[in-house]
Curated annotation (Swiss-Prot):
Range annotated as the organelle transit peptide: 1-23
Gene of this entry: TRR2
Co-factor(s): FAD
Name of the protein described by the UniProt record: Thioredoxin reductase 2, mitochondrial
Cofactor comment text: Binds 1 FAD per subunit.
Amino acid sequence: MIKHIVSPFRTNFVGISKSVLSRMIHHKVTIIGSGPAAHTAAIYLARAEMKPTLYEGMMANGIAAGGQLTTTTDIENFPGFPESLSGSELMERMRKQSAKFGTNIITETVSKVDLSSKPFRLWTEFNEDAEPVTTDAIILATGASAKRMHLPGEETYWQQGISACAVCDGAVPIFRNKPLAVIGGGDSACEEAEFLTKYASKVYILVRKDHFRASVIMQRRIEKNPNIIVLFNTVALEAKGDGKLLNMLRIKNTKSNVENDLEVNGLFYAIGHSPATDIVKGQVDEEETGYIKTVPGSSLTSVPGFFAAGDVQDSRYRQAVTSAGSGCIAALDAERYLSAQE
């Protein structure tokens, strides 16, 4: 169970009003997020004696503290763990390591950030009318959530046959030598389908329209792969199974309106992700896709002192290990920035 960890200086103000206490809170560096990027940044900054504060949120981005990784049942590709472990277990270990080195972890959700002046200001959920907390630097590591279809049966079989990451989950035993399906019409869908052919008996790609949005080169690769079957003008209607694992997908041809049951043991969504950037919207440069724009090879953004790490700025890889590396980069960038301000 995740506990609320508060640094000692936050417990010595008994009797002081909430508004006065709020005015007194200033952090040298603040990390917003609770996934691999956030905790890796916290570990590096804490070991460098930068006294980081990490706001892990209550239900940030619709996910409990720990981020998207907590929805993954088995992780087999994170270095150092030859025996697979769950996403929740991995994040609990990272959290303990952050706390061990002195990170001030606060289980509150940051709901508003003001980057217009220094120090930066932030407010937490249910405290928007209070005096803001101030901070000299911010690392935003709020991640991105996979877009879901919300099909009937989806909640029952989420991570029990339904996933939004083929690279993360495609190799697990329940998918090996089984028919699988991918929903999407872009490059991501084609890439995931091609990846899944390493493990599946065959892979269906369900495309809503009568053509791909994918690049020509990706389309050619799909056409040449004998283990991939493309179903154009096709939508999914319902996920079915035995109550434990997915084994069927109800589909419909949008031209003929004919419905059928498609036998599949895995369904992968490849319809995009939504980066959690609402709290800084309009204050920092973003890519056209909504991801925070960073200087290549760094976590630097258009606002000095404001850094972005993990999936909130990575629209391509979105892996736990790449997020962790990004968190390390952000910590080093923030440390250099703060040292230069002294």
